[in-house]
């Protein structure tokens, strides 16, 4: 459906802004596919979204292949989440994004400063190996579980490292441009998407009320028949 396609672009951008506003992360981008140029990749699947309930499955893996997060989230959205008096910038699904952000931060805090430095080095070398495999051969090893480990760092004056870093910076610039597109789309659909969620929430509640009342009537009828017998 068109709404789900729009959500698939809107929700990652809302999570991006949530992570950035927390102040615990550096650059956060929305990208169409995984990239070896980054330290951590977060992926998601929308399982349910009707304005009243939202359910997603989130996975997060760092450049070493280590899993940070792999779990489902289901949240019931209260009516006050759609209030015009809520805090500016707060999405009706904000509680969901906050839960994901908190879990990612908890996973990061389990790593030492040395482990985080190694993670950044592995991300850089994996990207370099993708560009020029022979120049970065032997710097990393991958175990049977698929985890990358740092064997050694290249020489500080290695010209291939400088070239790789220059290429990566150009890729970052392209991703920045792509995120301007996502930002424009985000602000363009923000109001109609919220209106749809609010209306959908009310319809879901009405439908559930009708089902409940129909069940009560049916049960009462069955009891009446039993009593008559």
For each of these PLM feature ranges, what is it?
Residues 43-84:
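Amphipathic beta-strand/beta-sheet edge segments enriched in Tyr/Trp
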Residues 223-229:
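Short hydrophobic membrane-inserting alpha-helices and related fusion/pore-forming segments
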Residues 1-36, 99, 103, 180-181, ...:
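N-terminal segment of the mature soluble domain
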Residues 69, 76-216, 229:
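C-terminal/domain-edge helix-coil "capping" segments
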Residues 218-221:
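Hydrophobic H-region at the start of alpha-helical membrane spans
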Residues 31-46, 119-126:
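Acidic helix-start/capping segments at beta-turn-to-alpha-helix junctions
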């Amino acid at each position: 459906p068109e709404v789900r396609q729009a959500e698939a672009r809107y929700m990652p951008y809302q999570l991006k802004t949530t992570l950035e506003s927390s102040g615990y992360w550096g650059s956060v981008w929305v990208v169409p596919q995984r990239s070896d140029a980054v330290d951590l990749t977060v992926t998601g699947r929308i399982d349910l979204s009707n304005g009243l309930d939202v359910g997603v499955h989130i996975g997060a893996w760092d450049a070493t292949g280590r899993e940070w997060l792999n779990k489902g989230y289901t949240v019931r959205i209260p009516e006050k989440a759609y209030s015009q008096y809520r805090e500016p910038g707060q999405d009706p699904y904000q509680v969901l994004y906050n839960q994901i952000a908190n879990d990612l931060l908890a996973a990061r805090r389990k790593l030492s400063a040395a482990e985080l430095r190694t993670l950044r080095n592995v991300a850089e070398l994996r990207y370099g190996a993708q560009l020029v495999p022979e120049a970065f051969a032997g710097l990393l090893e991958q175990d049977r579980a698929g985890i990358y480990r740092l064997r050694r760092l290249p020489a500080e004056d290695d010209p291939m490292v400088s070239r790789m870093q220059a290429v990566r910076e150009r890729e970052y610039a392209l991703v920045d441009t792509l995120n301007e597109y996502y930002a424009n789309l985000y602000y363009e659909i923000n109001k109609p998407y919220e209106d749809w969620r609010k209306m959908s929430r009310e319809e879901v509640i009405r439908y559930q009320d009708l089902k409940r009342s129909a069940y009560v009537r049916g049960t009462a009828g069955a009891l009446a028949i039993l009593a008559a017998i």
